[in-house]
Amino acid sequence: MKISVRNLEPTKVKLTVTVEPEELNPYLDAARKEIAKQVNVPGFRKGHVPGKIIDQRIGFAAVAGEAVNDAVPELYSKALDEKKIRPMAQPEFDVQDVPQSANDETKLKFTATVERRPDIELPEIDGLEIAISKPEVKDEDVDKRLETLRQRFGTLVGVDRPAAKGDFANIDLTAEIDGETVDSQEGVSYELGSNTMLDGLDEALDGLSAGEETTFEGTLEAGEHEGQKATVKVKVNSVKAEELPELNDEFASEASEFDTLDELKADIRKAAAQDAEGRQATEARDAFIAKLQEGLEIPVPKGVKANMVEEQLKGMTPDPEKATKEQKAQAEETVEKDLRDQMVLDALAEKLDVQVSQSDVFNFLASIAQQYGMDPNNFIQAIIKNGQLGSAVQEVGRSKGLLAGMRAVKFTADGEVVDLSAFLGEAAEDEESESVEAASAAAAVADELSAKDDAKDAE
């Protein structure tokens, strides 16, 4: 098999693959056997028709067509491995030459255009030192958490005064467009200042007492008339204020497992400290990834970026085509960062010879299934059938590479070494003997999992 590579862009290549007849013959033979199982030829049992008869009766074109369909993806995969090209999208195939008969010496020739991960020269990480912030818990952090807990035990009490920010008003709403009522709601409980309903509602309610009403102009945010201006009439039925419990030992015993307020505060401070350490670990991760990219110009694949931006916009606006310039710019910035981070972590996994085992993939997918309350086995089989196992393997490889890389780095805060072992864990002592690169391990794992699934079905 002869392979030539033409660089179209820094992240896009065109492979031209020429296949010798002896390399194509096994695919032709397999195609003949498969066709023989499907056709009836007088004088022969089904599935036992000689290849030459298949060529004569069915036609070599049908045989070659099926053979090419099977051969091209496999030979493309081999070409990628041989040329060490890491694809980031599905290829565009163009079959140019195909033998027209069993005796035709024409070589199968096809091209594959695909976006690829660029070559990334990562720095040596052994002995690397990265400075991060020191975790800090302030008194106001504890007070803020305590106040949040206090609000959970608050009660609403009716008040005979105008509504103010923080109060809860029971209201009736009527929206009109050109004098016609288009929407109405009764008995809605609304917190003034929350700005969770119509624009202008907070201002309209401020200062109103129970039994009073007013009108204001607002834009409807849902329903058939979404986005249209409407005249909204609001009536206040009642006003309630939140009454909070006193901060004392009695509150502590009611709101927690502790008997005193001091004990409760100490526990809150401990939880705040743990959260601060978690934020420090996140900062360390981000700083490490940024350090790997320091001084590097990493191009991103245009097509992959465009698809990801489109998906990002779907989560930002109901109609991506009507997205604002600011939304598009934000989506592009987010996608470019995510892509560069992913490509760098993939390169790191290869550099560190990361090993991805079947149990790694199982544990990763099972944890996702658990988060969504799904049966792990059903979820894993769905991933396999949808062709998403490769992405899962890549994600596992990135995660393992990231942890291994961070373990090799010294993180410091105010000149002192930071111990992140609680978040990074320890390196696995017993790894599988065969090194499997994260980007190419999916096929082997998928075959093994699928084989088990087939065996179960056969029982």
UniProtKB/Swiss-Prot annotation:
Subcellular location: Cytoplasm
UniProt function note: Involved in protein export. Acts as a chaperone by maintaining the newly synthesized protein in an open conformation. Functions as a peptidyl-prolyl cis-trans isomerase.
Protein name as catalogued: Trigger factor
Occurrences of domain PPIase FKBP-type (ranges): 166-245
Gene Ontology biological process: 'de novo' cotranslational protein folding; cell division; chaperone-mediated protein folding; protein transport; protein unfolding
Domain text: Consists of 3 domains; the N-terminus binds the ribosome, the middle domain has PPIase activity, while the C-terminus has intrinsic chaperone activity on its own.
GO molecular function: peptidyl-prolyl cis-trans isomerase activity; protein folding chaperone; ribosome binding
Major place of residence: cytoplasm
GO annotations of cellular component type: cytoplasm
